[in-house]
Structure formats: structure tokens, C-alpha cells
């Protein structure tokens, strides 16, 4: 069976990944000259790596974790290679080597100061994970402090498993730490929740988490008005400036109660709640190895091929038309998967006279205009926290950024010593330099506006002074190359879609009414309900399983995000209340508690 996939973003690549393993013939057509969609990075003409935006990987990204472990890589490391037999020879107190996740460590100098005493001697020439399991120290695995100490003693890699490294190993193992900066250094606001804040948030989020049938209603309610005036000032700033704001790339003005409560729920379920970033540019760490792996499995890629029309015949797709170098090519297949952003897809639907489906996509038509930028300094800015991500709370464009060099490993930046990769979360607001929105400025003016807003912040300015850095040290300024000037405004070649209180209920299913047309992407319905790389992978897996079901083939692995058993049980009880037109379970529980308290 032949499958044609339109779009080589995360979701399209996921479909190819899952189906090629099941024996399908896969062809991918992509309008750009490289894969990755919104996640891709690239290197400019000066070989400086650049990202669409800084990209965080949450602790509940289980579908991403699973698929990333299947993508082999060759990690470029400046370390020696050792065989397992060589490591086994170093097993004494005065010469002690060990292995951890295929890396080789010389712990000889650490033996005497090891807080666990002589247990470390048992690791000589062995796999540390096995020793920790044997002596009850499993918690050492991926513990941040343990890993930081261990990495000081790394001397090489294990030859036998060098090629078995995966994309998952390219994740920076350290936690991404956020810090809030205000324009006035003495205007620091406390970011914390008091017990009344916790009670209110428990009530607010509990209504969502402990619901099922009525949950969709909470995705239509804006979060921001529910917090204003209800939380303490420190609590309010903690939520809006961080969790429901630029800290995680959300627009607080369009975030719904349902999305935020879901985000909190899935985070709370995790034993370790850290967010991570890649240890090198995203395409080099993930996308490029993935494409190479898929090609090795037989997937055929056709870049610079843009879908222009869908030819429908009764209840099936007859063919697709794609454009390549001014030439129109007709494509035929058994099944078709459209994995492009909903805005471009809607344009195709209209051109193809598929108006019934287009009407549904019209309801998704809310563009998220976050703009990505890079600033390179020829002197190092010494940030006071490790592995930091920074939020300029008072900046008109709600700027968030992080220094790439603190997170990337062995990535040559040339003359650049500090490379800030950032995002304008709210570029539609008026800037403080030109008094215009970022979307109505020319590209060069926008760069100057960003620099101006950065240096308006006393915290950033003082940090630069301590590092002997000024605006004169900026040698590289860039707006992500998807953006260009048109009719006095900035527009992007690839529009970004995110779910919010307006469009959540209109997210489409992966299966269409046409028997051989499927769609995939993070705009489709997923169990995670949060626009993210995880939802893109999940959507790809859902689409893959629909096609596998069609041909009676075994399904691929798919992690369905869901509540823990006790929460699921209470949600089902709330369904009964909902059918009886009672209020939410949380409210009813509070009423019962108050009644019992008064009666008692």
C-alpha cells in the first residue's frame, strides 16, 4: 500500500516513521527545502545556527520520548572511544573507571571524597546503573546533582554502543530554570502563592480536572479574567508572568481555563517536573537524524513540492496536484495524509471546492503571531543562574529568551560568545522605541526595537555592565527568516496555530469523511489538548493507527494522556451530576462540606 504524506513537519514525519516500519510505501512532499516545520532550525550564510524559537520539552512528552529513542544518531563529541574490555581493566581503588548510559568515566580522583563511602568501589569496570540498582540507589539515575558531578569525570564513550545513541540522548539533561526580570531592578515583585491562592486555584482547576462531559465548556472560558482580583498580587504575577504567560510561550489574553488546568494536571502527575531543551540546534539534534533514518528505511522525500489542489471523486480522493519549479505534477496513492498548518490547508480546500470541510477550518482561523529573534554578542554575558530562561515581564512585546551557549554542547558559534534566542510573545502591542506594534515595523526597525526593550531592563543592563558588555558588542541581529515585509506589515511564510478559548472545540479529528484522506498535526484533536511538539507526535500516531486499522495491521505504540484512576472515577461521577443539571462536582463537594459543618 502506498501512502502520500503532504508536509514534513513533526506530525508528518511521525506518520512516515510508524507506517514505513509496517511495510507501507511512503512518499513525503514538503513545500520548503527542508523538514521540521515549525520546529526546524537552520544555519545562515555565516554558519550561525538559529531556531524558530527556544523549544522546551515537558516532563509529560511521552510520545515524543518514545519516538526519539528510536531515532539513531552519531553524536559529535571530542572524547576518546573505549571498548568494554578496556573499561573492565580499570577496577581498583587507584584506577577506577565505570560506564553510565554508554559514556565512560574515570572516578579515581572521586573515590576518597565519595559521600557514599566504599560502595563506589563496586562500580569499578562496571555499569553504574546496575550498581545503583543492586545497592538501592536507583534515585541516582538522571538526578541533576549526581549528573553534574558525574559529568566532571567523563573521559570518553563506549565503542560497542556508540552508534546506538538516539535523539533522546541529545536532550540537555539539566533543568531549564526560569527567572523574571523587571525594567526597574528595585521593582522586583514576589512570585509566590499563599494558602488562599492555593484554595482558589484548587477550586478553579478542580472543576476542570474533575469533569468529563462538561470539560469542553471550560476550554471556552478565558483564564485571565478569572484570576484578576481573585489572587494575591504575588500569586497573580506568578501565574500570569510565568506559568500562563511567556514562561511557557502562552498568550495570557487567549489562554483558556481548560488548557491551563490540563497543563497543570499533567505536570503534577510527573515525579520529576523539569523542562529541558536540546543540547544543539533542533534540526541537527532531532530533525536531520530523523530524515536520514527514514530515508534508510525507504521513505522518499520530495522537497520544494507544494500542494496546490485536491481532486475529489465521490467519497474518495482521486489525486493531488503539487507544484515544483513552476511545473504541476499529479500524484496518485492508495491513501493520503495532509500534515500542514490549518491555514494553508484551508486555502487548498477552497481552491479544491471542498467547502464543507473548509467551513470547519474557518473556525480554526486564529493566527498566533509570535516572532522569533536572535542577538549575538562578541563578548560573554555572565548570567547568574545556570541553564536559564529569562522573561522580561515589563517589556511591551513580552520578550522571553535564553542564552543558547549555556544549553548547547560543543556547538561552534565562531566570534559569537553569547547568542540570545528569544520570542516576542505579544508583538501586536505598541513598542517603547517606535510606538508601533512589532508586526507593523520594518525588519531592521524591529531588531532595534527589540534591543531597545532589552536594554530598558535594569537587570539585563546591570548584568551587561558587570560583564563589560554593551550594545556595541552586538555583531549579529536576526529575525527568523520566515518573516518578510509586505504592504507595510510583517507576515510569515508559515503561519503558527495554537489552541485557545476560541477554537478548541473546532479542532478536527484525524479521520475525514473521505475514505482515503487523513489529516495530522497538532491542530487536530489529541488527548493532551495542548498545542505542542507532544501533540504533533501524538496526532501522527493517531493518524498512523487509523491507517493501520484500515488494513488490519497491528497498531503502533501510542500513549494516551489521561487522568489518574481516582480522578477518572470522580470525573465519571460528575457526568451523572451534569446529566441531572447539577453544578460541578467540586462545587457540590464544597456545598456538602459547608452543610455538614453548619449542621455539626
Question: Which role does the model predict for each range below?
Answer:
Residues 311-331:
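Conserved beta-strand-loop-beta-strand element in the redox core of flavoprotein oxidoreductases
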Residues 546-589:
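Active-site-proximal substrate-binding core of FAD-dependent oxidoreductases
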Residues 2-27:
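N-terminal Rossmann-like FAD-binding beta1-loop-alpha1 element of flavoenzymes
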Residues 20-43:
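Glycine-rich FAD pyrophosphate-binding loop
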Residues 185-193, 198-316:
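Active-site/ligand-binding neighborhood in enzyme catalytic cores
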Residues 267-278, 321, 333-335, 340-508, ...:
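C-terminal segments that line or cap access tunnels to active or ligand-binding sites in enzymes
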Residues 43, 56-79, 161-177, 234, ...:
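N-terminal FAD cofactor-binding segment of flavoenzymes
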Residues 78-163:
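B-type heme-binding environments
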Amino acid at each position: 500500500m502506498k501512502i502520500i504524506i503532504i508536509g514534513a513537519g513533526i506530525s508528518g514525519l511521525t506518520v512516515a516513521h510508524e507506517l514505513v516500519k509496517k511495510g507501507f510505501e511512503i512518499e513525503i512532499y514538503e513545500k520548503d527545502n527542508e523538514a521540521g516545520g515549525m520546529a526546524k532550525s537552520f544555519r545562515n550564510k555565516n554558519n550561525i545556527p538559529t531556531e524558530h524559537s527556544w523549544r522546551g520539552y515537558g516532563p509529560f512528552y511521552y510520545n515524543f520520548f518514545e519516538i526519539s529513542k528510536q531515532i539513531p544518531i552519531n553524536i559529535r563529541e571530542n572524547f576518546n572511544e573505549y571498548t568494554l574490555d578496556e573499561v573492565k581493566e580499570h577496577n581498583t581503588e587507584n584506577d577506577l573507571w565505570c560506564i553510565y548510559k554508554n559514556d565512560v568515566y574515570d572516578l579515581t580522583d572521586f573515590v576518597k571524597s565519595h559521600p557514599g563511602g566504599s560502595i563506589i568501589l563496586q562500580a569499578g569496570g562496571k555499569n553504574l546503573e546496575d550498581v545503583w540498582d543492586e545497592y538501592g540507589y536507583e534515585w541516582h539515575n538522571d538526578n541533576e546533582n549526581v549528573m553534574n558531578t558525574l559529568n566532571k569525570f567523563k573521559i570518553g564513550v563506549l565503542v560497542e554502543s556508540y552508534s546506538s545513541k538516539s535523539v533522546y540522548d541529545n536532550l540537555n539533561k539539566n533543568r531549564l530554570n526560569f527567572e523574571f526580570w523587571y525594567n526597574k531592578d528595585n521593582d522586583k515583585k514576589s512570585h509566590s502563592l499563599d494558602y488562599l491562592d492555593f484554595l482558589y486555584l484548587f477550586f478553579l482547576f478542580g472543576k476542570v480536572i474533575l469533569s468529563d462531559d462538561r470539560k469542553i465548556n471550560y476550554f471556552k472560558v478565558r483564564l485571565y479574567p478569572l484570576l484578576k482580583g481573585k489572587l494575591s498580587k504575588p500569586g497573580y504575577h506568578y501565574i500570569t508572568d510565568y506559568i500562563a504567560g511567556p514562561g511557557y510561550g502562552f498568550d495570557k489574553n487567549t489562554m483558556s481555563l481548560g488548557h491551563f488546568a490540563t497543563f497543570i494536571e499533567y505536570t503534577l502527575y510527573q515525579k520529576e517536573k523539569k523542562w529541558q531543551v536540546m543540547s544543539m540546534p533542533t534540526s541537527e539534534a532531532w530533525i536531520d537524524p530523523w530524515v536520514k533514518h527514514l530515508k534508510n528505511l525507504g521513505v522518499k522525500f520530495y522537497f520544494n513540492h507544494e500542494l496546490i489542489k485536491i481532486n475529489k471523486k465521490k467519497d474518495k480522493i482521486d489525486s493531488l496536484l503539487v507544484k515544483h519549479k513552476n511545473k504541476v505534477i499529479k500524484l496518485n496513492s492508495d491513501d493520503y495524509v495532509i500534515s500542514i498548518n490549518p491555514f494553508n490547508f484551508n486555502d487548498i480546500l477552497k481552491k479544491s471546492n471542498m467547502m464543507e470541510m473548509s467551513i470547519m477550518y474557518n473556525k480554526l482561523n486564529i493566527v498566533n503571531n509570535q516572532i522569533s529573534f536572535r542577538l549575538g554578542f562578541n563578548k560573554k554575558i555572565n548570567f547568574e543562574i545556570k541553564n536559564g530562561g529569562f522573561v522580561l515581564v515589563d517589556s511591551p512585546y513580552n520578550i522571553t529568551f535564553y542564552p543558547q551557549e549555556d544549553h548547547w554542547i560543543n556547538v561552534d558559534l565562531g566570534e559569537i560568545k553569547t547568542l540570545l534566542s528569544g520570542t516576542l510573545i505579544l508583538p501586536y502591542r505598541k513598542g517603547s522605541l517606535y510606538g508601533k506594534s512589532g508586526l507593523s515595523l520594518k525588519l531592521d526597525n524591529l531588531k532595534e526595537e527589540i534591543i531597545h526593550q532589552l536594554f530598558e531592563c535594569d537587570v539585563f543592563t546591570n548584568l551587561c555592565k558587570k560583564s563589560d558588555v554593551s550594545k556595541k558588542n552586538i555583531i549579529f541581529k536576526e529575525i527568523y527568516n520566515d518573516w518578510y515585509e509586505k504592504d507595510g506589515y510583517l507576515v510569515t511564510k508559515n503561519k503558527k496555530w495554537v489552541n485557545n478559548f476560541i477554537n478548541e472545540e473546532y479542532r478536527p479529528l484525524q479521520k475525514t469523511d473521505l475514505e482515503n484522506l487523513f489529516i495530522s498535526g497538532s491542530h487536530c484533536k489529541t488527548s493532551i489538548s495542548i498545542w505542542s511538539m507532544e501533540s504533533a507526535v501524538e496526532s501522527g500516531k493517531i493518524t498512523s493507527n487509523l491507517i493501520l486499522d484500515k488494513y488490519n495491521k497491528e497498531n503502533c505504540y501510542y500513549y494516551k494522556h489521561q487522568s489518574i484512576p481516582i480522578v477518572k472515577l470522580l470525573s465519571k461521577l460528575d457526568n451523572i451530576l451534569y446529566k441531572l443539571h447539577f453544578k460541578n462536582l467540586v462545587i457540590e463537594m464544597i456545598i456538602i462540606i459547608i452543610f455538614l459543618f453548619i449542621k455539626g
